[in-house]
Amino acid sequence: AGSLMTSTTADNLATALRLASSGFAVFPCQSGGPKAKQPMPFIKWREVSTTDQRQINLWWQKWPDAAIGLDLAKSNLIVIDADRHGEDDGVAAMGELMSERRYEPHGVPLAATPNEGTHFFYRQPEGKRLGNSKGALPAGVDVRGHGGYVIAPGTVMQDGRLYEVFGDIAEAPEM
């Protein structure tokens, strides 16, 4: 990478408000420490995630460093989460799966996660409520959907690492 990090966790509020104004439901998560990526204490995210700007401002006043949780059900999204952990390279596996199916991910928004993983964002297909699954796809690749959340693209973690964004949201392909 080698690029200079100019974003700070202070930008998370602006990012959360921008996501909310586009109709994506957000909530505050911890941006560092042993519970990084978990919802803030006493935040029942499935109940309280929102697009309400006033509520979002209140949360970030209370927790200015909060990471942004993205409620996938309320946001009508599915995320394919390809990780690199030890032996499992989900990013490579996902690339192979896509080329086997001759599926070109052009225009699919990707978020590069701080641990060299990739989140592929899709809209829920019309009339479906695809949930979370582990193990249906190759090792290192999970699906998060209805009932799940991810750290939102554009989020800066406490250590300065970024969930970097590329592209617009397409409908999920048949895999």
Task: Locate predicted features.
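Conserved phosphate/metal-binding and DNA-contacting active-site motifs used
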Residues: 1-175
